Structures are given as C-alpha cells and as structure tokens.
Amino acid sequence: MTIQDDMVGKHPIENDFWKWLQHEDTESSDLKRHRYLEVDSSNRDEAIKSVAAWLIKYHLSEGKKRVIRKKQEILEKHDFAEYAQSLHVFPKSDKTQKGNLGEIFLSEYLSQTSGVQILVYKLHYNPNIDQSMKGDDVLLVNPDKVLLGESKFRSTPNKRAVEEASELMKDKLTLPMSLGFIADRLFEQGKDELGEVIFDLQFKMSSIEIDIKNIGFLLSTKKVRSIVENNLSSPNSDFIFISLGMDDPAAFLKSVFDYAESNLLEGSYET
C-alpha cells in the first residue's frame, strides 16, 4: 500500500474509471505526496461520456428532474428541446465551466477511492449558475473522515498553478468551512439525524481526533505530472496533491459540456 492509498484510498480498477483513467503514485517524501492521473487517449470518448453524466448529476437537482420529466411527457420533441435549453442548467461562462469541471471530477474521484458518499450536491443550490459558489471547492464527509479539496483548471500547467492549488493547505492542516451548509441541506431534506452528526463535527474537529485530509487538485495537460513533481513542497503531512493530465484539456472541457447539453435536450438526463 502506498502513502497515497492510505490517505485517499486505492485507485479504482474495476469500474468506469478503469476504462479510461490511468494512475501513478509517485515516490513520496516528507514534503511531497502526489498521485498522477491520466486520461487514456484511446478511451477519450468514454471519458467524455462518463464526465458528461456527472455534469448532469451535479447541476440538475431531483426536483428539476421531476419537472423536466413531466414536460417531456406532454411536449413534442422539438418543443421539449427548446424548453430544456431555456432552463440554463449549465454555465456558459468559460471560467465557471472550468471551475465546476475540476470540482466535479475531484469529488467523484475521491468518493470512488475513499468510499465517502457525497451528501449534498452544492451546485443544486447555486442561485447564479454562471458564477462559482463560495465555500469549500470539494468537501466529502462522514462521521469518521473529512476530505477537503482545492481544485484548479489550467490549459497549460505551471509552477504558479501548483502553488494556487496548494496555498490554502500546504503549510498546516486546513479545516472545512461548509459543514454548516451541508447540515442545513440535510435538515431541509428531513435527514435530521445525519444532519446533526455533520453539524456536530464542527465541534468535534477541535476536540477529538478525526481523520482529515487536505487535497490539492490540478487538471491540465500531461505535462502536469512533471510540473507538480518539480514544484510541490508541503510540510502538512495530511496534504496530498492529485493531478490530472490529458491531451488538450480545453477541447475536453468543451466536449463534456456539449455532450451533457445534448443529452439534456434529447431527454437523456437520468444518471
């Protein structure tokens, strides 16, 4: 077992990730803990389909799905497509698309590796879809473990991007800010018992030992591996950096949002 396995869990090898996502746990040191992920170019289309499905899941709430499903039953195909397009489910802003893609990918990956479920999809509560939401980029939590992530997207990787994805967490253990937000959403859903557990974690984090891990994430080209290896330095022993490399990340970004939008307009929005 690698240090990376111990911190965030083993890379998944028997599900959709295995088809198109390769991984390498690079050699660790006191100042560097790095897992490199790479989209397999030969399975890029599978990656686009998988990630597009995540975009729909993270942007489209169950309530909105019910309304859309009802409209789909009564509208002609062309009229339904016009209706679905008018809903503005996905951001048009390039900056927001990049931010959302990174956060969604990291959330899905960490949930797969750690087994910690995503309790609340925060983008369901975004009042302005073209602006990023404030608060923690990525937060997965259960009574025993907290995974807090900072995500960045760069078309070209560089030292500054690594620093930006690390700066909030690299020097000392960072605690989440959004536990109250998650608890409130659970209370609204009638999940009072779970909501109380999450709400109480704010106190317990300062008084008892809970496994908290900080994660920096950078999505970029395949050069990101060497950029992170050469520039990552963190004395925070609970900090790990995950990088994702692929051919032409800007084109990938456009493809996944276009595919998600197309599926929505065609009525294929169930995930």
Swiss-Prot record:
InterPro entries: AbpA_HamA_C
UniProtKB keywords: Antiviral defense
Changes seen on gene knockout: When this gene is missing the Hachiman system does not confer SpBeta resistance in B.subtilis.
Database matches in Pfam families: HamA
Cysteines engaged in disulfide bonds, as pairs: none
Keyword Transcription attached: no
Entry keyword Magnesium: no
Gene Ontology biological process: defense response to virus
Source superkingdom: Bacteria
Function noted in UniProt: Component of antiviral defense system Hachiman, composed of HamA and HamB. Expression of Hachiman in B.subtilis (strain BEST7003) confers resistance to phages phi105, phi29, phi3T, rho14, SBSphiJ, SpBeta and SPR.
Protein name as annotated: Hachiman protein HamA
Native source species: Bacillus cereus
